[in-house]
Regions:
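A structural signal for isolated positions on well-ordered beta-strands in alpha/beta enzyme cores
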Residues: 97, 138, 178, 254-256
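N-terminal secretory targeting modules
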Residues: 1-140, 145-154, 158, 314-317
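Conserved beta-strand scaffold positions in the cores of enzyme catalytic domains, especially
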Residues: 139, 177-179, 280-282
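Short glycine/proline-enriched coil/turn segments at helix->beta-strand junctions
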Residues: 45-47, 92, 172-175, 251, ...
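Alpha-helical cap/lid subdomain in secreted, periplasmic
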Residues: 71, 200-317
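Solvent-exposed, flexible loop/coil residues
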Residues: 122, 192, 298
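Conserved SGNH/GDSL esterase-like catalytic core that processes O-acyl groups on lipids
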Residues: 34-36, 147-234, 263-264, 295
Length: 317
């Protein structure tokens, strides 16, 4: 058996996305504060994998959840409270994907070290190697982008980042994703878990760790829903400022703002996107089925994911 440490795993994965090395309980972990963060690697000649994680939730939260799949097949979901799980590979070569798939608004991900933490992966025979590169799309957003409330009204257990509109779209595009998205967040409203507004979480991984931005093929922005309690003038100023930040951070990458599925601040987003000379993704009629009038349920997520993939395919050619 070979044990892959957090540092070894970090060297394997591409893109690094929002993963970083963080010390917890006097040991290194492969850590992320983002629901929907993904690992991709090849298991070469491995019989079985054991993934070891911390039960790192808030004491008042349900268990965090991870999901995994082999070769793009069915996703399987695992409770972090069990601290480990097995993946049967049966030798040969297989693409393994692991995604952070459930947490709670109570988890203090920003300043309380209650993000997702992988301690090691054990491989029985064979070895782990980096996966072949595929197109990378960064998605900046809120709980809808992260994958909350897709399967129902229960925190963590009903989250589905693996099959929400982002997960659906990247599968159809044979791409992968980096999610810069936090529940309840906006350009004016702070997110849950102690997370600040989007202008601040864009460039940081938690309260003390800055993010070295990746170089994706595309950047998609889906923000605005959570800012609806603020005035139009406030939103216009903050969204304008945020677009300036994103274009500065990704100066040579196509950046595509989306109108939220609820059409919140649609006219403002159209106007400001035009001001910044960016292409706009219109979404009127994309999603006809919701969990709670704002978050697409699985049917709505699949529907909107197909439509988004169709739009983004023109930018990945």
């Amino acid at each position: 058996m070979h044990r892959y440490s957090p540092n070894s795993l970090y060297k394997l994965i591409h893109p690094h996305g929002r993963w970083f090395i963080k010390g917890l309980n006097q040991s290194a972990t492969l850590y992320t504060t983002n629901l929907g963060s993904r690992l991709r690697f090849i298991a070469k000649g491995v019989n079985n994998l054991t993934v070891n994680v911390l039960d790192n939730r808030n004491p008042f939260s349900p268990s965090q959840i991870y999901a995994w799949r082999i070769d793009g097949n069915q996703w399987h979901r695992e409770l972090a409270s069990h601290r480990s799980w097995h993946i049967e590979c049966k030798s040969a070569n297989h693409l393994i994907e692991i995604i952070t798939a459930g947490n709670s608004d109570l988890d203090r991900v920003w300043n309380g070290d209650e993000g997702f933490a992988i301690t090691s992966i054990d491989a029985e025979q064979g070895k782990l190697i980096s996966a072949p590169p595929v197109p990378v799309i960064d998605f900046i957003g809120d709980s809808i982008t992260a994958g909350c409330w897709v399967a129902g009204h229960n925190a963590s257990i009903d989250y589905r980042p693996e099959s929400n509109y982002v997960g659906t779209a990247v599968d159809l595009l044979h791409a992968t994703d980096v999610r810069i998205a936090y529940s309840a967040g906006g350009v004016l409203r702070q997110a849950t878990g102690g997370v600040p507004t989007a202008d601040q979480f864009l460039t940081k991984l938690d309260a003390t760790t800055f993010w070295q931005a990746n170089t994706p093929d595309l950047v998609v922005i889906n923000l605005g829903v959570n800012d609806r309690r603020f005035s139009l003038d406030q939103f216009n100023a903050s969204y304008d400022h945020f677009l300036s930040l994103v274009t500065t951070l990704f100066p040579s990458i196509p950046i595509l703002p989306m109108i939220p599925f609820s059409q919140t601040f649609a006219e403002s987003i159209r106007s400001l996107t035009k001001k910044h000379k960016l292409p706009l993704i219109e979404t009127q009629g994309w999603c006809s089925s919701f969990t709670d009038d704002l978050h697409p349920d699985q049917s709505g997520a699949t529907e909107s994911g197909y439509r988004l993939a169709e739009k983004l395919s023109n930018w990945l050619k």
